[in-house]
């Protein structure tokens, strides 16, 4: 919600013309979501604001997605948007606990990030541990119906899942960056 309509339109054109990736926030907290609805009454859903400006496609990375409901998750999956889960930040600024297991089960592309602006750690080891703890909290919130992330899954989200967005092969093979 910090960009004008003109800037959003420019960024959409620039990303399209140059094939650039786009990173932003989506459904991080309820106050932000209400603010976006006020700023864009023509868009029924938060994600539609990005789509309106050409910023909603397979080159899009959306951080947080804590409060993304089934419809928003479907829209992300269909567009090929990558979710970047930032558990340390989400916990630190009281955003909530993202339904990462549900996102993975629904076929969304999910990677792990630090969002150092709101989090405490740049270390992906620390953020992996935060993601696993957050998934355990989410499991309790979901009445024990979802499983929590395992260590291998957490490490995959911290490494190969993010690399896949940039077209790199998964794993720690020679030549991977």
Q: Where do the PLM segments sit?
A:
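His/Asp/Glu-enriched, well-ordered alpha-helical/loop segment
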Residues: 52-59, 101-177
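Short, acidic/turn-prone active-site loops that include or flank metal/cofactor-
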Residues: 28, 87-91, 116-118
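Glycine-rich, flexible loop/turn motifs
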Residues: 32, 89-90, 145, 168
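Histidine/acidic residue-rich metal-binding segments in metalloenzymes
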Residues: 1-82, 94-110, 170
């Amino acid at each position: 919600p910090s960009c004008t309509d003109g800037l959003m339109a420019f960024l959409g054109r620039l990303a399209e013309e140059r094939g650039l990736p786009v990173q932003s926030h989506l459904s991080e907290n309820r106050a932000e979501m209400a603010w976006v609805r006020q700023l864009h009454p023509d868009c029924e859903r938060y994600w539609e604001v990005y789509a309106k400006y050409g910023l909603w496609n397979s080159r899009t990375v959306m951080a947080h997605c804590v409060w993304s409901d089934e419809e928003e998750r479907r829209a992300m999956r269909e567009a090929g948007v990558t979710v970047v889960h930032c558990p340390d930040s989400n916990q630190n600024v009281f955003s909530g606990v993202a339904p990462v297991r549900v996102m993975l089960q629904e076929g969304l592309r999910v990677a792990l990030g630090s969002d150092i602006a709101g989090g405490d750690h740049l270390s992906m080891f620390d953020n992996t541990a935060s993601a696993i703890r957050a998934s355990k909290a989410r499991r309790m919130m979901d009445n024990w119906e979802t499983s929590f992330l395992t260590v291998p899954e957490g490490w995959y989200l911290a490494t190969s899942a993010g690399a896949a967005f940039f077209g790199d092969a998964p794993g720690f093979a020679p030549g991977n960056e």
